[in-house]
């Protein structure tokens, strides 16, 4: 008990946390980190009182503007009128953390924290910043003028100090350095997954794969970065029956209308349906009903959903702009260049024409790969190293 009482306090300040689910992988990373490292660190959260950018209603199952016990962490949910620098300052003083962890570079909460630290309005404390893919070319191309302006301002005002940066992969490390320069403390640790995904999985529950048909799922927040509109043109060339269900929050209504207009012109053998957001506890039971997972994303720093898909026996059909590479050599899917739509047509046609036996082998390998990857002890070790490195670095400001 004494050991638990002496754990270093890590204050995580983020836009969204449990019981939410619509903000996707960034939220899952935090929840998994708390679950797996909660015996080593005393996690506290300051977060908003609602779920994602599309849902503005406050949670009804937590106490707002008070501390709540959520799993292995204490969580303070800010009402909209209390998302202010002065409120953050008081809460940081109250917690008196050993380190602060931020999971977005562009969040208003991050701006508040970095400004408070720079102006010495709070006690000096190490800052860990995990930008969660925000520096990928695809992500930066969206609202690029606003983002570039903020990057220039942050540098000129010297808000970045001696931050400890957490990248989920070597490719994300390179993206951060390309934008902010190489003179940074960047540590690489994969985003924290759960210890096992879909423990009671049964291969027999997968749907039969008939030659000439395939069921695919696009499970993601629906936004321009996920690049669904790009996929529609290659789909026109596919012979045979192909259905794609879009599962996730339609975060960009204008973008969805653009896509919908194209969807309405698709040939009759291509079926595209929208299913809306899926609560996280239902994700695996949903994924297992599909043959393949598809996502032509402009960039992902990690992609929890890829692990969930493979754990559900769904081979991946994704762009080559994620850390999950060489999938074809591993026999668990395909990572394809967006520059060559023809390669997507070839793979999609192959999937449609695959026999049940061929599909079963591919599905089994995808599941086995995910299970073995999740067992790696280096996942916890590398994430603990990031937190311990920051704690041992002193205030850093």
Predicted regions and their residues:
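N-terminal subdomain of nucleotide-sugar transferases
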Residues: 1-58, 66, 397
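A conserved mid-protein helix/loop that constitutes part of the nucleotide-sugar donor-binding site
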Residues: 28-31, 214, 218-237, 254-257
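Glycosyltransferase donor-sugar binding loop
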Residues: 48-53, 193, 219, 243-260, ...
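Nucleotide-activated donor-binding/catalytic signature segment of Leloir-type glycosyltransferases, i.e.
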Residues: 74, 256-281
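Membrane-proximal helix-turn-helix segments that form the acceptor-binding/catalytic region
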Residues: 147-165
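Aromatic "clamp/platform" in nucleotide-sugar-dependent glycosyltransferases that forms part
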Residues: 298
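Short hydrophobic beta-strand element within catalytic cores of glycosyltransferases
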Residues: 315-319
């Amino acid at each position: 008990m004494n050991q638990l009482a002496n754990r270093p306090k890590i204050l995580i300040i983020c836009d969204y946390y449990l019981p939410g689910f619509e903000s996707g992988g960034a939220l899952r990373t935090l929840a998994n980190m708390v679950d797996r490292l909660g015996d080593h660190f005393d996690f506290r959260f300051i977060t908003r009182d609602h779920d994602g950018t599309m849902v503005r209603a406050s949670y009804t199952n937590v106490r707002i503007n008070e501390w709540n016990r959520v799993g292995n962490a204490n969580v303070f949910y800010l009402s909209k009128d209390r998302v202010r620098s002065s409120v953050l300052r008081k809460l940081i003083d109250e917690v008196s953390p050993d380190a602060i962890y931020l999971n977005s570079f562009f969040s208003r909460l991050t701006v508040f924290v970095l400004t408070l630290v720079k102006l010495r309005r709070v006690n000096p404390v190490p800052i860990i910043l995990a930008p969660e893919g925000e520096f990928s070319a695809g992500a930066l191309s969206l609202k690029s003028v606003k983002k570039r302006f903020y990057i220039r301002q942050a540098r000129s005002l010297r808000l970045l100090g001696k931050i400890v940066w957490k990248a989920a992969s070597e490719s994300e490390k390179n993206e951060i350095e390309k934008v902010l320069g190489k003179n940074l403390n960047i540590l690489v640790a994969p985003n924290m997954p759960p210890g096992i995904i879909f423990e009671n999985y049964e291969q027999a529950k997968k749907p039969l794969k008939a030659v000439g048909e395939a069921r695919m799922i696009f499970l993601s927040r629906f936004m321009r970065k996920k690049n669904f509109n790009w996929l529609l043109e290659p789909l026109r060339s596919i012979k045979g029956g192909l259905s794609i269900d879009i599962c996730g929050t339609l975060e960009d209504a204008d973008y969805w209308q653009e896509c919908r207009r194209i969807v309405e012109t698709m040939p009759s053998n291509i079926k595209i349906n929208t299913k809306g957001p899926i609560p996280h506890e239902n994700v695996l039971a949903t994924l297992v009903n599909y043959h393949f997972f598809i996502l032509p994303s402009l960039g992902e720093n990690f992609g929890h959903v890829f692990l969930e898909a493979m754990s559900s026996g769904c081979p991946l059909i994704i762009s080559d702009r994620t850390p999950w590479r060489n999938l074809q050599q591993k026999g668990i899917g395909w990572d394809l260049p967006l520059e060559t739509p023809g390669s997507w047509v070839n793979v999609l046609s192959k999937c449609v024409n695959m026999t049940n036996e061929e599909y079963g082998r591919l599905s089994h390998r995808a599941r086995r790969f995910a299970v073995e990857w999740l067992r790696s002890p280096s996942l916890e070790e590398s994430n603990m190293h990031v937190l311990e490195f920051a704690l041992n670095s002193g205030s850093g400001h």
